Amino acid sequence: MAVFTAVSNADLALWMRHYDLGDVVAFRGIPSGIENSNFFLTTTRGEYVLTIFENLTAGQLPFYVDLMSHLAKHGVPVPAPVARDDGTLFGELHGKPAAIVTKLEGAAQLAPGVEHCVEVGQMLARMHLAGRDYPRHQPNLRSLPWWRDTVPAIAPFVTGEQRALLEGELAHQAAFFASDDYAALPEGPCHCDLFRDNALFAHAEPDTGHSVRLGGFFDFYFAGCDKWLFDVAVTVNDWCVDLPTGALDAARADALLRAYQTVRPFTAGERRHWGDMLRAGAYRFWVSRLYDFHLPRAAQMLKPHDPGHFERILRERIAHAGALPETHACN
């Protein structure tokens, strides 16, 4: 989340006339992230987040806001879009689509432990199952077609060794995506960006036996229909990584994956291709971070991420694929 489009007090006052949310108490931009303009909004009715969509069109947006509504109605803790006075879930601000959603409880855990990974794994599986009957379809817009379009644009900015890795991994993933095994993998709506800063944790209730409690997942604006295993791989590559080296932390990865499969057991095909999908998850973010770093957009509060982090992760996943835990295997 970042701020590309500024919103004045006068802009906000006009915008809020379309909502029954009381009077504005506080309003400030959110500096983290790189895709949309985001603001914390506090009113006399509660706390919310206002998002102005910098790339998604009004035609694309219903997939995302309706998905959050669908998941919230199925008991998954996600931000719920707030309806406007005409019943719609988004409008237009400065000529761009914009929406208000509820603000989740809790704070991000940027140094997660095993207990946090257990909570994330279980809820990710619940989210996947809750999305099975979601009627809209939107492909993951940062998948293979986007990689093919983007790699030539970033190639002039990287070393020869990096270019060889970019092109070699693209060929590997293209062959994987074209396989019958890939086609058979379970799929549905995915978050596609479930990093540790896109989940919140609140204090656990007394006498529950839990040391932490997941407040919820947010920032669904990279979501799309994809293989569930890709969503798991993206999540593991962030929540279970040793930051200096990019290697997987075995204890955290095992905890997250075992927790996930207590809700949705992995298939035999998913087990065969776990290594390929870990590489796909790392590749997707290496490519996007290279693009954002070398071809940045103007923003008031933009903080680009280090592309080298996911280059290290990709090299580690190629060298050490790992395996899914064997408990609760199914065919």
Curated annotation (Swiss-Prot):
Catalysis performed (reactions): L-homoserine + ATP = O-phospho-L-homoserine + ADP + H(+)
Root EC class: transferase
CDD domains documented for this protein: HomoserineK_II
Keyword flag Nucleotide-binding: yes
GO biological process, one term: threonine biosynthetic process
Keyword check for Nucleotide-binding: yes
Pfam families per the UniProt record, alphabetical: APH
EC number: 2.7.1.39
Pathway named in the protein's UniProt entry: Amino-acid biosynthesis; L-threonine biosynthesis; L-threonine from L-aspartate: step 4/5
Gene3D superfamilies in UniProt: 3.90.1200.10, Phosphorylase Kinase, domain 1
GO molecular function: ATP binding; homoserine kinase activity
Swiss-Prot/TrEMBL keywords: Amino-acid biosynthesis, ATP-binding, Kinase, Nucleotide-binding, Threonine biosynthesis, Transferase
Stored HAMAP family: Homoser_kinase_2 (MF_00301)
Family statement drawn from the similarity comment of this UniProt entry: Belongs to the pseudomonas-type ThrB family.
PANTHER family: AMINOGLYCOSIDE PHOSPHOTRANSFERASE DOMAIN-CONTAINING PROTEIN (PTHR21064:SF6), AMINOGLYCOSIDE PHOSPHOTRANSFERASE DOMAIN-CONTAINING PROTEIN-RELATED (PTHR21064)
Protein name (record): Homoserine kinase
Organism: Burkholderia pseudomallei (strain 1710b)
